[in-house]
Design a protein with these regions (language model features):
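A short, N-terminal amphipathic alpha-helix
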Residues: 1-12, 24-29
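Short, high-confidence coil segments that cap the C-terminus of an alpha-helix
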Residues: 10, 59-62, 89-93
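Hydrophobic/aromatic residues located in beta-strands of well-ordered beta-sheets
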Residues: 13-15, 65, 95, 123
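A conserved hydrophobic position in a structured secondary element of the catalytic/binding core
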Residues: 17-18, 70, 75, 152, ...
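Short phosphate-binding loop-to-helix
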Residues: 20-68, 74-82
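Conserved core of the sugar-phosphate nucleotidyltransferase
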Residues: 76-163
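Donor nucleotide-sugar recognition loop
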Residues: 164-171
């Protein structure tokens, strides 16, 4: 909450959580929280529910939604601002903060989601496995690691929320 507030302002920061204790804490320090269902499989589902709740409560129509997953408490305000600034291009529907690494431990760690992008920086593929992979295991390569910080246009978030889980996600 604190770091996000530094990036986009307290008035533009809302915590979406299924945990009453977290919601109460956020509200005790003057923040806004939306209690959501505990049944969500993806963080984007929780955020989409929160957007719908905010709009139904008279909060107006949300245009851009920045999402910082709860396991990313150390993301700096400047990083979040960079992701949100991507949305100044009307053609951008989703922005995903990634960082490059050549550290083999980070690359093979299944807790790190890796992403392959095309020349226009569109995400092609996400994996917990080491991607891209080299046919020659002795080659040193780099990868892009997803941080858990995203920005969505409202419509893109709600559309993404409606998509069925893909076969790749089920693996």
């Amino acid at each position: 909450f604190h770091r996000t507030s530094l990036a986009v302002g307290r008035e533009n920061t809302v915590v979406a959580t299924c945990d009453v204790e977290i919601a109460e804490y956020v509200e005790s320090i003057g923040g806004r929280a939306v209690l959501t269902s505990s049944d969500h499989e993806r963080a984007t589902n929780r955020v989409a529910e929160a957007v719908n709740v905010l709009e139904a409560d008279g909060g107006g129509c949300v245009d851009i939604v920045a999402m910082v997953q709860g396991d990313e408490p150390l993301v700096g305000p400047e990083s979040l601002r960079r992701v949100v600034e991507c949305m100044s291009d009307p053609d951008v529907q989703i922005a995903n903060l990634v960082y490059p690494t050549s550290n083999p431990e980070e690359i093979v760690d299944p807790n790190n989601v890796k992403v392959v992008i095309d020349r226009l920086k569109n995400a092609l593929y996400f994996s917990r496995a080491a991607i891209p992979a080299s046919m020659n295991s002795s080659n040193v390569f780099s990868a892009l690691i997803q941080t858990g910080v995203f920005a969505f246009r409202r419509e893109a978030l709600l559309l993404f929320n409606e998509l069925e889980e893909s076969n790749l996600e089920k693996i």
